[in-house]
């Protein structure tokens, strides 16, 4: 009887390691492997400062991330080896207030 070997198909789980910037508040760098910044441009690393480990997490089976789009993160990690998460733009509370006041005044004029 002939023995047949079936190759094992290993699914490579996608993990990422997230580092916090020491220079910029609310700025995070996602890389594929812990302490491997070899694919991150030198200029970016200089501006980022000393990376501070924030967390490691699996991306497979995950539906979303808190402050980043999951598919963009996966694509960036695959294509360029890193993903940079910048802080959200600051809220312009004065503009929001003036806008709501303007809307309320226009309703009062009717």
UniProtKB/Swiss-Prot annotation:
Biased composition (Polar residues): 97-110
HAMAP family per the UniProt record, alphabetical: UPF0745 (MF_01866)
Region (Disordered): 88-110
Pfam families: YcgL
Gene3D superfamilies xrefs: YcgL domain
Alphabetized PANTHER family for the sequence: PROTEIN YCGL (PTHR38109:SF1)
Protein name, as recorded: Protein YcgL
Residue ranges annotated for the YcgL domain, each copy included: 14-98
PROSITE patterns for this protein: YCGL
